[in-house]
Amino acid sequence: MNSSIFNKLKSLRNRYEEIEIMLSQKDTISNQEKFKNLSKEYLQISEIVKNFIKWEKLETDIKNINLLFNDVEMHDIAQEELFIVKKQKKKLEEKIKILLLPVDPNDQHSCFIEIRAATGGDESSIFAGELFRMYTRYAENYMWKTEIMSSSENERGGFKEIIAKVTGKGACGRLKFESGGHRVQRVPETESQGRIHTSTCTVAIMPVRPKTKKEEIKVSDLKIDTFRSSGAGGQHVNTTDSAIRITHIPSGNVVECQDERSQHKNKAKALSILSARVYADKLAKSQKENSSMRRILLGTGERSDRNRTYNFAQNRITDHRINLTIYKLNEVLQGKLDLLIDPIMQEYQADMLSSLSEFKL
């Protein structure tokens, strides 16, 4: 075993035992904040510690079985027993490796989905609308809530741009692989000669930060403009300056919100999106430290990232990042997105495991 890994596991076990004692002490029980923090840490490391203890027991079992080989009568039994225990040990090693992988703290958070029509005119906007419906149906499968934060509709259907908030545990962890370019190939309804057109949309996934950890944005760094809404809102449309445009001067990020009748609500939505964008920019910089494969899988939400091609004529979706092709386009558009997300997550995990290549228990 890699000595640094072994020492880490021993250290975790010692800490686990230490917390166990502390949780039973009166001064800890009487201090709610301390008790809460220790309980959380205890829960976080308990699974890996329990599996490490099992591994140590299997190591001891193997040593004891090897002693049986000195007895001729026990040789066959020992050989059979050794095979079983080694198999158990190997399976446990793989589990421990996965448990040792760093956990992205944003994976359990909610997220914003930003979909923009890129090349292809009306067809691109229509496809943006279909992508939004796909993500909405996918969210329903996990009982996540979807709320439109900002949208710009296209006259012929779909959206030029739409930003939605997906609220639910684990939303960001599963949807983060959607960032990048999405390409559609099909014959548009307006095409009289039956020619296949190619259009593109970009998707960006931004984690929603907890209120206690939201990016601090200085008011002095913001330029806030109000204007009359041109979207939904009934009789109040174009009668009050309820729409908001906020520019974050240092980064150049601009967010517009006009879906609500209330200027205050539009401002609150715009600020929450802006906070997520500023944080997403920081994440993008930190991802440069990731391996090239992980950067490809996560994407950046830029047009240059080519995630998938959706070919309607062939009922085909190809994910170019892992060379995966499935002929279930209709099912995916109905929300069965795990057909694509699960293989991506497995590839991502495999790449992270490769960084633990020296870890041989």
Swiss-Prot record:
Keywords noted in UniProt: Cytoplasm, Methylation, Protein biosynthesis
Keyword Cell inner membrane: no
InterPro entries per the UniProt record, alphabetical: PCRF (IPR005139), Pep_chain_release_fac_I (IPR000352), Pep_chain_release_fac_I_sf (IPR045853), Prokaryotic/Mito_RF (IPR050057), RF-1 (IPR004373)
Pfam family, one: RF-1
Cell compartment(s), UniProt: Cytoplasm
Post-translational modification: Methylated by PrmC. Methylation increases the termination efficiency of RF1.
GO molecular function, one term: translation release factor activity, codon specific
Superkingdom per UniProt: Bacteria
Keyword Electron transport: no
One GO cellular component term: cytoplasm
Chain positions with N5-methylglutamine modification: 235
Family classification: Belongs to the prokaryotic/mitochondrial release factor family.
Role of this protein: Peptide chain release factor 1 directs the termination of translation in response to the peptide chain termination codons UAG and UAA.
Official protein name in the record: Peptide chain release factor 1
